[in-house]
Swiss-Prot record:
Residues at which ATP binds: N34, F35, S36, H37, R73, K156
Named cofactor requirement(s): Mg(2+); K(+)
UniProt signal peptide: none
Gene giving rise to this polypeptide: pykF
GO terms for biological process, alphabetical: glycolytic process
UniProt keyword ATP-binding present: yes
Binding site for Mg(2+): E222, D246
Name of the protein in question: Pyruvate kinase I
Organism lineage: Bacteria, Pseudomonadati, Pseudomonadota, Gammaproteobacteria, Enterobacterales
Organism of this sequence: Salmonella typhimurium (strain LT2 / SGSC1412 / ATCC 700720)
Site (Transition state stabilizer): K220
Highest taxon of source: Bacteria
EC annotation from Swiss-Prot or TrEMBL: 2.7.1.40
Annotated function: Catalyzes the formation of pyruvate in the last step of glycolysis, it is irreversible under physiological conditions. The reaction is critical for the control of metabolic flux in the second part of glycolysis.
Amino acid sequence: MKKTKIVCTIGPKTESEEMLSKMLDAGMNVMRLNFSHGDYAEHGQRIQNLRNVMSKTGKKAAILLDTKGPEIRTIKLEGGNDVSLKAGQTFTFTTDKSVVGNNEIVAVTYEGFTSDLSVGNTVLVDDGLIGMEVTAIEGNKVICKVLNNGDLGENKGVNLPGVSIALPALAEKDKQDLIFGCEQGVDFVAASFIRKRSDVVEIREHLKAHGGENIQIISKIENQEGLNNFDEILEASDGIMVARGDLGVEIPVEEVIFAQKMMIEKCIRARKVVITATQMLDSMIKNPRPTRAEAGDVANAILDGTDAVMLSGESAKGKYPLEAVSIMATICERTDRVMNSRLDYNNDSRKLRITEAVCRGAVETAEKLEAPLIVVATQGGKSARAVRKYFPDATILALTTNEVTARQLVLSKGVVSQLVKEINSTDDFYRLGKDVALQSGLAQKGDVVVMVSGALVPSGTTNTASVHVL
């Protein structure tokens, strides 16, 4: 059974009910909507289509809204055509938005472009395809020397590696998009270009103000500043997306894999979800099979301990969206089989919290008894994630009375969530847990299961692990 979850970006190729149903069958767990593209009518229809499929088939999936985020882009060029730049030539960026660009100058969207940069800084355009070095700053213009040949287009992203940028965490478009997400009841927001703790706090306050206090925030780490402030960002977030695309432009490409491993490790320790994203099966946008390197990359992220792996263009606009999900699911299943439990987490001398100690003990017991299932009663999802932290061989069945928690746990590795009407007592939980275990086919008659619970209210009081035979 596949334990690692798959996030699929849904676009024109995959938005129909028929395709969404096939994607769920193939292994999709979370639908990602990329708000850098599309309008509210399109995204609203995609959400409706997925909900229709779920209500017809009983399948479970969560919805993730990915913000455009505060970014710098090039503006207009003459005739809207790309211009060819040559290595060694001089090229100018201006903050005067009325300028129509050519092969010597282009306007950018960011007012503070001239004040944030200094001579000697690097400017990268279009995911780093064109590099330039700042040679002078004059008024509202930044004059650069072009470092390599390339074609510059309109609306292309501009990165300033190693430069601290004074952009707000939420652009005006993001604020409107988040309100739309609150109205639609999405489960997660993936917040782009998070640089510091206050960015996350600002987004959380905006969500709360519009009825989205239950929406979980997944912070995307895409630059050096985000890496430098990673610990404080993690503390303020519900999860992290390792956004390797922009990150690989902002920091040296050979550093990306080490940043990935560091972030995944810290997320596991903090019991926060982590998604590994970007270019995972990139060649499948055009080809029916991935490269061997891509297959290895997906497996490597899973071995690192990621909760989920993500498809972007592969499932949104590629030629082989279904094949991409199927192949990714196959790699997940194969790699999940060799993952061993990690009971040595917290070998540091830190004292365990009660919940963590009980959950660790439950995993250890399940391993020793070869139990196929650990059943957890959870209100907000923390207990289920505390069990997941130790990578049990057993599947984690999370029973919750909270519909939001049931959907959000869809993103956690190895967790199957089940919404139940009510749990009135510990005995009630044991009875319910056994019933669901058998009905779902996750365990058979005669199997040993470990059950984890606590005081029924309030949440956060897990204190009991017990062993039962079905």
